C-alpha cells in the first residue's frame, strides 16, 4: 500500500512539472526600484543628501522631480506632498509630466513664501510604470529672502520714483521720503548704507524711520550747492525686517538756483562792458608774447591759431574804442602781428590753421592737414580788413599798416583753391600732401565769409559760378522748413551749431543782407531762436536747460570737443552761443548773460571771462578758454551795442565789389 502511494506521488509531481506549475498561476518577476536623480526648484538644484545646503530656492517656480524610469502617473498626486515646516500647512500642487513621464512637475497653486522652510516628501505610494517601487524620501529647502521694494520716493516734496528729471530741489533742510513695501530692519538704516553724495563728498544727514519702520525720512542737514548734481544712494545692505533684499538703488537730483547772486548786481550796460573787457584779456594779456597772435586755447603754449587771431584782431578794435587799451597800444600789437604774418609759412597766400608762435612754422592740424587752410585764412583776413578800415590813412604810421595789410590781402590766392578752375573752393592744400584732404567748402555753415572774400579779392578773385555752384550747391543750401513754428531759410534741420551765425558775421553785416537764397538777418535770427526754443523745450530732459540757460554750439565737453546743436545735444551749454547772439536775440541773450554771471559765476567766471562750457547734468564745468569762442563774444556784443565792426568791414570798397558779383543786396 505504501509503495503504491509513493508511486502516485511521483506521478503527480511529474505531471506538475510537465504543466509548469502546480497551482496554474504564473510566477511574477522581482520588481525593480525607482531611482531619484534630481530635484530642482526652477533651475535651483537641491542637495539630496544635505538639506541644510538648500538655502536659496526661488518662490515663483515649479518643482521638477526627476527619476531614472518611467513613472505610473496615476500615483504621483498621492505620493508627492509639500508642506510649510513651521505650520504644517500643505501647499496645493498641480501635476504634469515631462521627459516621457520620467519627470514630475509640481506647480504650487500660489507663490511660495519668502524666507520660509518647506518640506518635500515623496511616499512609497509612488510606483514606476513597470511596478518599480520607491522608498519614502523627504528633504527640505529654504526659499530666498523676499524683495524689499521702494513704493514711493519724494525729494523735497516732488515725486521722484518715476520722474525722468528731478530738478529745482531746495538748498536747505532738504527732505527725502522713501516708503518701502515691507518694514525695514532698523539696524541696516545707517549712514554707510543710505546717504546723499555731492561733488564734495557725502552730505551730512539724519535718518528717521516711521510708520512701523516702512517709511524712511532723510533730512539733509547741510546747505546744498545750487545748480548742482547730487546722488541718493541706498545700498543692497538695506534689508527688510525678515531679511527681504533691496536692490542697490541710486537716484540723481539737481538743486535749484540760489536767489543770492554770486556777484554784486550792476547795470546791464556795465555788465556788457565788464564781460567784453574780461574776455578781451584773452587776446591781450594771454596773446603769444613773440607774435601777438591768439593761442588756440589756454593750454596751447606756442601754438597759435590763424582764425582765432582774426577774431582777436577784431577784439583789439573794441578794446581801443572801449578804452580797455590805448589806440597806440592797439597799433603796436597790430604791428607785431603783421611782422609775424609776413614771415610765417604761407601756401599760395593762405596761412595754416595752426602756427608756431615763435617761428611761424606750420603746426599740422592733422596728419594730412599741414598746409594752407582757406577758411581760417578768411577769418584772419576778415579781422585784418576790418582793422584796415579802422586805421587813419592821413597818419603816416597808420597808412604804413594799411599798406602792409593790403600786401597780405592781395597775395592770398583764393583762385588757386578752386583746384584748377573748378566751380568750388577747397579748404586745404599743402606742398607735400597736395589736395589729399579733398575737402570742398560747401554751404550752409560758417564759411560764407570765405566765398565772400574770394569774390572780393582784387588780385585773385573767383567767378560768381564758384559761389552759386560750389557754396550754394545750385540752391541745395535752402531749407525752408519750420522748427517750433520758426522758418529756417538755409542749412540743415534746426540750423546746426550757433557759430554758423557768428564767424562769417563778425564783420559781414547781416542786417538787410540778402541774395537769391536768403535774407541773412532772417536766417541768423531764426536759427538763433530755434536753438533757444529747443533748449527751453529740452526734449532730452537735461538738467539746467531753461530760458536763461541756453545755447548749443561747438565747444569743449566732458568727453572732449564736439559741435553741439539740437541734433547733437549732449547736455552742454556753451556761453559763447547765447552771448555772441546778442544782435539776434537781445532779450534772450541778456537773460543768459545774467544767469551765467550772477547764478553760475562762482564756477563759470574766470580770468578771461566765462569758461568754455558747462554740463549741469554731469556736474561738469570747463576750465578751458578757446580763441574761437572768446572772440565772437567781444565782437558780437559790440555789434549789438554800436554796430562798430559791421560798419567798418562794410565800408571796405572790396565788399561792394563782392556784393555786386554775387548778387547780394543790402
Where are these regions (language model features)?
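Bacterial N-terminal signal peptides that target proteins for export
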Residues: 1-9
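C-terminal motif of bacterial Sec signal peptides marking the signal peptidase cleavage site
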Residues: 18-21
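Acidic, low-complexity Ser/Thr/Gly/Pro-rich repeat segments typical of extracellular/periplasmic
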Residues: 26-260
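Ser/Thr/Asn(+Pro)-rich, low-complexity disordered segments
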Residues: 258-666
Amino acid at each position: 500500500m505504501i509503495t503504491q502511494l509513493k508511486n502516485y506521488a511521483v506521478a503527480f509531481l511529474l505531471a506538475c512539472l510537465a504543466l509548469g506549475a502546480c497551482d496554474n498561476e504564473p510566477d511574477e518577476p522581482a520588481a525593480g526600484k525607482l531611482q531619484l536623480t534630481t530635484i530642482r526648484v526652477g533651475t535651483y538644484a537641491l542637495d539630496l543628501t544635505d538639506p541644510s545646503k538648500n538655502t536659496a530656492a526661488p518662490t515663483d517656480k515649479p518643482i521638477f522631480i526627476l527619476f531614472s524610469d518611467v513613472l505610473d502617473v496615476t500615483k504621483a498626486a498621492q505620493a508627492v506632498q509639500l508642506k510649510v515646516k513651521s505650520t504644517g500647512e500643505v501647499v496645493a500642487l498641480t501635476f504634469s509630466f515631462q521627459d516621457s513621464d520620467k519627470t514630475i512637475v509640481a506647480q504650487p497653486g500660489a507663490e511660495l513664501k519668502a524666507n520660509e522652510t518647506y518640506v518635500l516628501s515623496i511616499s512609497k505610494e509612488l510606483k514606476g510604470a513597470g511596478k518599480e517601487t520607491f522608498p519614502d524620501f523627504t528633504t527640505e529647502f529654504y526659499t530666498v529672502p523676499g524683495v524689499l521694494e521702494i513704493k514711493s520716493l519724494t525729494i523735497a516734496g516732488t515725486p521722484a520714483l518715476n520722474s525722468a528729471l528731478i530738478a529745482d530741489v531746495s538748498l536747505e533742510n532738504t527732505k527725502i521720503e522713501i516708503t518701502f513695501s515691507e518694514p525695514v530692519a532698523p539696524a541696516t538704516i545707517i549712514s554707510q548704507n543710505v546717504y546723499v553724495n555731492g561733488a564734495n563728498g557725502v552730505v551730512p544727514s539724519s535718518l528717521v524711520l516711521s510708520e512701523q519702520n516702512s517709511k524712511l525720512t532723510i533730512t539733509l542737514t547741510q546747505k546744498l550747492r545750487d545748480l548742482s548734481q547730487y546722488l541718493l544712494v541706498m545700498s543692497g545692505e538695506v534689508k527688510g525686517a525678515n531679511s527681504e533684499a533691496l536692490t542697490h538703488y541710486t537716484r540723481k537730483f539737481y538743486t535749484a538756483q540760489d536767489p543770492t547772486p554770486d556777484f554784486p548786481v550792476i547795470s546791464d550796460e556795465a555788465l556788457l562792458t565788464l564781460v567784453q573787457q574780461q574776455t578781451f584779456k584773452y587776446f591781450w594779456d594771454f596773446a603769444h608774447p613773440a607774435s601777438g597772435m591768439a593761442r588756440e586755447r589756454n593750454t596751447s603754449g606756442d601754438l597759435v591759431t590763424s582764425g582765432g587771431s582774426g577774431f582777436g584782431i577784431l577784439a583789439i578794435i573794441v578794446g581801443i574804442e572801449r578804452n580797455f587799451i590805448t589806440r597806440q597800444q592797439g597799433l603796436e600789437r597790430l604791428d607785431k602781428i603783421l611782422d609775424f604774418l609776413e614771415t610765417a609759412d604761407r601756401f599760395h597766400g593762405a596761412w595754416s590753421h595752426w602756427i608756431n608762435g615763435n617761428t611761424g612754422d606750420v603746426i599740422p592740424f592733422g596728419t594730412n592737414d599741414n598746409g594752407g587752410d582757406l577758411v581760417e585764412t578768411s577769418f584772419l583776413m576778415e579781422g585784418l580788413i576790418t582793422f584796415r578800415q579802422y586805421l587813419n590813412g592821413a597818419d603816416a604810421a597808420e597808412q604804413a599798416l594799411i599798406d602792409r595789410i593790403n600786401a597780405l590781402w592781395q597775395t592770398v590766392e583764393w583762385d588757386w583753391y578752386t583746384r584748377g578752375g573748378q566751380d568750388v573752393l577747397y579748404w586745404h592744400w599743402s606742398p607735400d600732401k597736395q589736395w589729399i584732404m579733398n575737402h570742398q567748402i560747401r554751404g550752409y555753415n560758417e564759411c560764407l565769409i570765405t566765398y565772400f572774400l574770394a569774390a572780393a579779392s582784387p588780385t585773385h578773385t573767383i567767378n560768381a559760378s564758384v559761389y552759386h555752384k560750389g557754396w550754394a550747391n545750385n540752391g541745395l543750401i535752402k531749407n525752408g522748413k519750420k522748427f517750433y513754428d520758426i522758418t529756417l531759410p538755409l542749412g540743415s534741420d534746426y540750423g546746426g551749431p550757433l557759430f554758423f551765425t557768428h564767424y562769417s558775421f563778425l564783420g559781414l553785416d547781416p542786417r538787410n543782407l540778402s541774395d537769391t537764397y536768403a535774407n541773412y538777418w532772417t536766417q541768423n535770427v531764426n536759427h538763433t531762436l530755434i536753438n533757444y526754443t529747443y533748449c527751453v523745450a529740452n526734449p532730452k530732459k537735461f538738467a539746467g536747460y531753461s530760458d536763461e540757460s541756453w545755447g548749443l554750439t561747438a565747444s569743449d565737453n566732458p568727453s572732449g570737443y564736439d559741435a553741439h546743436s539740437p541734433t547733437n545735444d549732449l547736455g552742454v551749454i556753451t556761453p559763447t552761443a547765447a552771448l555772441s547772439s546778442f544782435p539776434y536775440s537781445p532779450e534772450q541773450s541778456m537773460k543768459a548773460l545774467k544767469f551765467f554771471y550772477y547764478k553760475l559765476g562762482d564756477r563759470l567766471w574766470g580770468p578771461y571771462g566765462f569758461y568754455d562750457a558747462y554740463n549741469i547734468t554731469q556736474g561738469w564745468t570747463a576750465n578751458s578758454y578757446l580763441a574761437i569762442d572768446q572772440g565772437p563774444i567781444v565782437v558780437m556784443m559790440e555789434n549789438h551795442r554800436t554796430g562798430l565792426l559791421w560798419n567798418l568791414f562794410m565800408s571796405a570798397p572790396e565788399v561792394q565789389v563782392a556784393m555786386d558779383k554775387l548778387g547780394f543786396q543790402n
